[in-house]
Amino acid sequence: LGNTPVMASVKQAEDRILRSQTTKSYVGPAGDVNYNETVARLLFGDQLLSSLGKRRITVQSPGGCGGLRLAAEFIRKANPDATVWVSDPTWANHTPLLGSAGLNIESYPYYDYSTHSIRFDEMIACLSKVSQGDLVLLHGCCHNPCGADLDHDQWDQIKDLALEKGFTVFIDLAYQGLGGGLEADVYGVRLL
């Protein structure tokens, strides 16, 4: 218990960094610029990234929890009255991470354990009542914990509803490349 093995590929990457590293100075508060640009290209693709111009920013965080906490702090400062809507079920850390930043948390129906399917009609009915300025947290792919992902048509319907109702979609994309592939797993991100 408490022993996380280090994979051979991680050891190889660490060796490569050790051989090529030229300084031990700190990186800036946003993280490593080259890393951030590579992540942005992987997430958005070259064409969308180019069209976004200066309307996006990439910040390196200490893991997924760190990124979610940074996002929660940003949301609270930008819109302290916003409610963040999370799926039922959602990853066990979503509610405490977002709630500890002082955000209001509500849930929307997502998964039916008896049929092993997404409760999409119920989800849309609930999200149609979300207030303008609220945020809806979606899992980009490999939904944690149920594994049931939205299809393209469902993503399209959510986009249309978000535009109509004025809520912001907030996507947790922890597993890009592990579902349908690197490109397929970012359909929702690139759509929205």
Predicted feature descriptions by range:
Residues 1-16, 27-41:
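A structural motif shared across PLP-dependent enzymes of the aminotransferase-like
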Residues 18-20:
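A short, surface-exposed helix-loop junction/capping segment
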Residues 22-168, 177-178, 183-190:
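Conserved core of the PLP fold type I
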Residues 173-174:
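Conserved Walker B
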